[in-house]
């Protein structure tokens, strides 16, 4: 049985502090190849996600890793000891990236050939791909069959009398791949078991890794719905695995802020407790670059050396109560986001880019449409709201005042770190800044009606008994920077505004 990684380093553009080895203000090109090497050699991450989804990426990554850092990789076999896993674009969603979907799959045999020469034995350097925005088993079957029948299967195609493709390019290995569904929207998360079952019946894998999104559901539905949806999905994943007699190894996509998972070197133990049954945690860029290297390494090693805990399988009654909370919360949350969208979109374009991202079309959270509103990616969304004194974690919170005793039991029983996450986020509330928003320039103006809803959520923090520490130096500094940012925008000092946004991100140790 292969090793199931505990840690997966990713290329999320969420870091505030640029690493010293980066040539420009953002990581691109050969820097990302070096970064992958660093993930393994310095941070001891067991897996790196190589991201073709919505960003430029080097298709020669395996060649460059083996050629440039052979002394390391000769002792750490890529595909056996450590892993490089592609995240593909979804061709059903991103029409302009359909050929990139095909191109990425075509590089897998190339990686095999390079690794075979380097190691002197057959090595599947890359054999797993992540399929984003998975909404049906057909997505996974299509990806698997495309690889098997088009990428590997073309060898038998006859080009001329007696001349086959294999005579030109050689045999193609591996003959098959493993497809990891990345499930991101509510409808798909609550029927993740049927997606898995449909795929397993066709593909008949020996085991399955399943990727549960955490950040985008938070942006689409709110903090608390995102956590509950993850718990429902994990429960259903294990239930269907038990039913099918199949080992399933979940991945959770957690980021550094409470809204996106609160997974950072200072909060690792809490996150491990929050997600029992999860095998692999995403170690995003801010985790590595916005904390001292030794702190990040120690945290990653702690995860690597920990063992997955027993999963929690919800009863049908618990699941229905959780879904009721999710629906009620989402209605309130989305109404508030609609009113904040104008300000969020304006600020998002001022935040520093940290990767060579392209426009990404898909859910509410990917250039996303919602009630006629378009929003940026989740990282920029979170960063924008923090930067006007409204931590996104608080949006929709007043809904909790209406929960009954049974609903509270399900919420507190399944969101283990609810109170500490809210406490962490609430320290970044800036009341003076929020009250200023209705009188701001049009780019940042927020209606009085929306602000009234936000203030109700803030009031609910006290009514719910959330223990919020007195603001420390960092939080007071953040509030001051928020005021300076608003003043800069109001007076059209845009370069100053950008500088204050970056300074705030450094205080938070993440853009978003």
Swiss-Prot record:
<comment type="similarity">
    <text>Belongs to the PEPCase type 2 family.</text>
</comment>
<comment type="subunit">
    <text>Homotetramer.</text>
</comment>
<dbReference type="GO" id="GO:0000287">
    <property type="term" value="F:magnesium ion binding"/>
</dbReference>
<dbReference type="GO" id="GO:0006099">
    <property type="term" value="P:tricarboxylic acid cycle"/>
</dbReference>
<dbReference type="InterPro" id="IPR015813">
    <property type="entry name" value="Pyrv/PenolPyrv_kinase-like_dom"/>
</dbReference>
<dbReference type="GO" id="GO:0006107">
    <property type="term" value="P:oxaloacetate metabolic process"/>
</dbReference>
<dbReference type="Pfam" id="PF14010">
    <property type="entry name" value="PEPcase_2"/>
</dbReference>
<dbReference type="GO" id="GO:0008964">
    <property type="term" value="F:phosphoenolpyruvate carboxylase activity"/>
</dbReference>
<keyword id="KW-0120">Carbon dioxide fixation</keyword>
<dbReference type="GO" id="GO:0015977">
    <property type="term" value="P:carbon fixation"/>
</dbReference>
<dbReference type="InterPro" id="IPR007566">
    <property type="entry name" value="PEP_COase_arc-type"/>
</dbReference>
<keyword id="KW-0460">Magnesium</keyword>
<protein>
    <recommendedName>
        <fullName>Phosphoenolpyruvate carboxylase</fullName>
        <ecNumber>4.1.1.31</ecNumber>
    </recommendedName>
</protein>
<comment type="function">
    <text>Catalyzes the irreversible beta-carboxylation of phosphoenolpyruvate (PEP) to form oxaloacetate (OAA), a four-carbon dicarboxylic acid source for the tricarboxylic acid cycle.</text>
</comment>
<keyword id="KW-0456">Lyase</keyword>
């Amino acid at each position: 049985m292969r090793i199931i990684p505990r840690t997966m380093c990713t290329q999320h553009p969420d870091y505030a502090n640029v690493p010293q080895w980066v040539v420009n203000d953002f990581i691109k090109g050969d820097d990302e190849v070096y970064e992958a090497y660093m993930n393994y050699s310095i941070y001891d991450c067991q897996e790196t996600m190589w991201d073709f989804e919505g960003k430029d990426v080097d298709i020669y990554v395996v060649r460059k890793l083996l050629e440039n850092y052979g002394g390391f990789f000769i002792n750490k076999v890529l595909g056996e000891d450590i892993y490089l896993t592609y995240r593909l674009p979804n061709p059903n969603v991103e029409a302009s990236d359909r050929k990139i979907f095909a191109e990425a799959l075509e590089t897998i045999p190339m990686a095999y050939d390079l690794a075979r020469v380097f190691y002197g034995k057959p090595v599947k350097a890359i054999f797993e791909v992540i399929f984003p925005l998975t909404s049906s088993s057909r997505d996974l079957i299509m990806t698997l069959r495309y690889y098997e029948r088009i990428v590997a299967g073309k060898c038998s195609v006859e080009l001329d009398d007696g001349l086959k493709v294999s005579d030109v390019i050689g045999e193609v290995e591996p003959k098959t791949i493993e497809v990891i569904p990345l499930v991101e929207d509510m409808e798909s998360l609550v029927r993740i078991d049927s997606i898995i079952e449909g795929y397993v019946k066709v593909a008949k894998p020996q085991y399955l890794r399943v990727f549960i999104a955490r950040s985008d559901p938070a942006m689409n539905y709110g903090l608390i719905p995102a956590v509950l949806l993850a718990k429902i999905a994990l429960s259903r994943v294990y239930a269907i695995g038990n039913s099918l007699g199949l080992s399933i190894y979940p991945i959770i996509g957690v980021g550094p802020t409470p809204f996106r998972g609160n997974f950072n070197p200072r909060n690792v133990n809490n996150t491990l407790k929050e997600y029992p049954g999860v095998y692999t945690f995403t170690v995003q860029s801010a985790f590595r670059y916005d904390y001292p290297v030794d702190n990040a390494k120690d945290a990653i090693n702690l995860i690597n050396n920990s063992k997955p805990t027993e999963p929690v399988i919800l009863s049908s009654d618990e699941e229905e109560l959780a879904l009721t909370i999710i629906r009620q919360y989402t209605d309130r949350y989305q109404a508030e986001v609609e009113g904040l969208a104008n300000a969020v979109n304006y600020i998002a374009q001022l935040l520093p880019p940290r990767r060579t991202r392209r426009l990404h079309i898909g859910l509410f959270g990917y250039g996303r449409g919602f009630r006629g509103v378009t929003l940026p990616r989740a990282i920029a969304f979170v960063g924008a709201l923090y930067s006007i004194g409204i931590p996104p974690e608080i949006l929709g919170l007043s809904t909790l005042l209406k929960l009954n005793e049974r609903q509270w039991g399900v919420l507190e029983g399944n969101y283990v770190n609810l109170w500490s996450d809210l406490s962490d986020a609430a320290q970044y509330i800036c009341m003076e800044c929020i009250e200023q928003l209705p009188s701001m320039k049009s780019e940042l103006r927020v209606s009085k009606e929306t602000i009234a809803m936000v203030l109700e959520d803030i009031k609910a923090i006290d009514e719910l008994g959330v223990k919020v520490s007195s603001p420390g130096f960092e939080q007071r500094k953040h509030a001051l920077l928020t005021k300076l940012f608003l003043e800069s925008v109001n007076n059209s000092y845009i370069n100053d505004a950008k500088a204050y946004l970056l300074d705030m991100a450094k205080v938070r140790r993440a853009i978003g």
